[in-house]
Amino acid sequence: MTSTIVQICRDCRSTLGEKRARCPHCGSPRLFAHPEWDKLAIAHVDCDAFYATIEKRDDPSLMAKPVIIGGGRRGVVSTACYIARIHGVHSAMPMFKARAACPNGVIIKPNMEKYVKVSREVRQLMLELTPLVEPVSIDEAFLDLSGTQALHGTPPSLTLMRFSEKVEKEIGVTVSIGLSFNKFLAKIASDLDKPRGFSAIGEAEALDFLGPKPVTILPGVGKAAAARFGREGVSTVLDLRRLEPRRMVSLLGNDGMRLTRLANARDDRRVTPEHETKSVSAETTFETDTRDAEVLLPILMHLSEKVSARMKTSEFGGSTITLKLKTSDFRLVTRSRTVSAPTNLAGRIYQAARALMQPELARGPYRLIGVGVSELVPAEEADRGDLADQSVAREAGMERAVDSLRARFGQGAITRGLVFAARQTGDKGRR
């Protein structure tokens, strides 16, 4: 095959010799064209509104309704379907704001055991394409399909189109795929055409593509960083490229050099298979800097749930919990502690992270919060407990029992008291 092809139908994968609005073979309007279609091999696969899509799959009566996954007035949104997003609901939004923005929304408490099971099914299909699969979270991963054309008989782009169709037909969820020559641009490409998207950013176009984009397209640049750049006369990626590297370092430290590389479409990170993974983490950047425990602690619980879900999906436990904070002046604060036994339970991750957070609350405000687990071990070595510390075994048993009851009787059968506990200052973070 050569790169002279104009269009490929994403549904029947016919190759079309001239530009058309629809495929003449199957009538689909989902046509893909790119001059580097047979060369690009780094992909980012992102499941569309993953939790909400699973709930709609399992209850078709929800299909046309705005579904919001989350719970408790003081909790945060885990996922919102695309209908709810039209009303302004988004991930990590406080639930009371989500209810106000979308009063007709159907609120469903997350069923992590179910979501982890589906995530593993999707991951297994990824591994049929390439062993180089790097999970990013429960619903997204990077894949490196370099050298797989001999195995599959097609370039990565066509292989990924077949994969997308297979996931939708066999598992009942949809994915958006970004294809490029590095991870940074593959991630951006996957966001260009959601849901059920398939987009590519090639090497020849990368600088021109990025140039006019706002600096917020770069990972880690939120409103506060954008405002700081604005004071330097920088609003676009092209503006940022024109800043002297020395000035970037003075503004943002090591982050400045990282952003300079990304602004120039350079990203040397490899796709790292999960057996090489050293840590599992999740983080979020706030629209407004805050030191308010009423805001920070529920989000800390949300992030702990995300890390726990990914660890269970990847079958890891870990013994070192790390809290990551970034101040309003971009100073990075990290605090770590080692727990008594490796864990992948959300409650234990949250307890450790919350203890690390308490002394830092007065030192904010913060623009970013993150939680990570490292010193990874196989999942069967996690949460065993021992004779010297029976509380570990009891806590692990309680959380597993809750997971089991929720799997049998629904997520509402038992409600975790962590969000209530987040309002306290002297408890153990659980009820």
Q: Language model features by range: what are they?
A:
Residues 1-261, 271, 309, 392-431:
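Gly/Gly-Pro- and Ser/Thr-rich, intrinsically disordered tail segments characteristic of DNA damage-repair
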Residues 151, 185, 331, 379-381:
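Residue-level signal for secondary-structure boundary sites
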Residues 180-184, 262-265, 317-328, 366-377, ...:
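A glycine-rich phosphate-binding loop feature that marks nucleotide/adenosyl-phosphate handling sites
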Residues 341-431:
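Acidic, metal-coordinating catalytic segment for phosphate/diphosphate chemistry
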Residues 106, 142, 322, 338, ...:
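Short aromatic/hydrophobic contact patches that present stacked aromatics
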Residues 48-50, 73-75, 328-331, 376-379:
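Short, charged/polar surface micro-motifs in flexible loops or helix N-caps
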Residues 1-6, 35-36, 44, 210, ...:
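DNA-contacting surface of Y-family translesion DNA polymerases
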Residues 141-147, 334-337, 378, 383-388:
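Short, hydrophobic beta-strand segments
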